[in-house]
UniProtKB/Swiss-Prot annotation:
TM ranges: none
Further remark: S.microcystinivorans can degrade microcystin, a cyclic, toxic heptapeptide that contains beta-peptidic substructures.
This protein's name: Beta-peptidyl aminopeptidase BapA
Oligomeric and partner information: Heterooctamer of 4 heterodimers ((alpha:beta)4); each heterodimer is composed of an alpha subunit and a beta subunit processed from the same precursor.
Lineage: Bacteria, Pseudomonadati, Pseudomonadota, Alphaproteobacteria, Sphingomonadales
Catalytic activities: Cleaves N-terminal beta-homoamino acids from peptides composed of 2 to 6 amino acids
A single GO molecular function term of this UniProt record: aminopeptidase activity
Organism annotation: Sphingosinicella microcystinivorans
GO CC, alphabetical: periplasmic space
Amino acid sequence: MHYLKFPAIIAGMLLAGAASAEGPRARDLGVPFAGKPGANNAITDVAGVEVGYVSLISGEGKLERGKGPVRTGVTAVLPRGKESRTPVYAGWETSNAAGEMTGTVWLEERGYFDGPMMITNTHSVGVVRDAVVGWLADVKWPGAWFTPVVAETYDGMLNDINGFHVKPEHALRAIQTAASGPVAEGNVGGGVGMQCFGFKGGTGTASRVVEMDGKSYTVGVLVQCNFGMRPWLRVAGAPVGEELAGKYLPETRGTQTAAATNNGVAPGDGSIIVVMATDAPMLPHQLKRLAKRAAAGMGRMGDAGSNGSGDIFVAFSTANANVQSVGGNVISVETMPNDKLTLIFEAATQATEEAITNVLVAADTLTGVNGYTIQRLPHAELRAILKKYRRLAAAK
């Protein structure tokens, strides 16, 4: 597994926070990207943002509900870190709503959320949400009620998803271990059991720095990828999915059949959650527009948007520390004029594309329930395909 150090191994379950980066990322393999990345090329390049993970991996063989195999986890994104009590302006959008992101009704109505933003598997949304409510009540705000933002993608191809292995303490640990700096990628956090374009999926991140009128603004993206059909996949414009259409396909190893594992999931069905952060001063309606650009980044990867895919996006701004002002009838906030947003939109598109590509590069082959195995995207063949289509850049 790339980009991850495990600080603890408990009863076969791997628990980790946001760890230092190790191993290659997409740029290291010569994948070309437009735009200037931040220092870590991660969502944490937006000052104050912290990311934490808990990755749960245990058991092997036949699926036994409640026992495993377990291939799942939790991801936490804290817009202003663990210590801040200040909400962030935010907006959300979807390009295909076959999924869930809690808290969006209230987010849409008031234009901000309290944080943290959590991502897990489809059937663990409730327990993670409840854990966050408890954390907010105990640690952050003495408020009357909370509506946390918790999103999901489906990991039932590899994970005992109906065994409910994600517990409140896992969500809390993801929050408590969240950190700034380099961010782990691949088979980590909520992304442990995911697939993407028929290869191993998971978690990825990227960022862009935009210069405007003598000022620098950063846009960071974190994705949990579980979407796309193999023939669609394009990397830097090269038809990687077509070139590898019959190779490295998911398979069942052992006595079980694929039918015993896929639970009727149609090809292309899956999901992607995209979290965007920026320090550019933007209001909720502008952040909703920013969130929409995730679909453009997905399109650069060749995605067409399948019927059963839950493609849900949220964007927030760390500017304007007086979002929730107490006292007074008027507050003053800063915002960028709409005619200055195009470069921010472009940065979000670029960072989304690179974050997804980083997932495919970082994620390792993983075997889960009933011996079902999802192969990693082979690095050498990716480079060969990029070279064939004259898209290979010098490795970073």
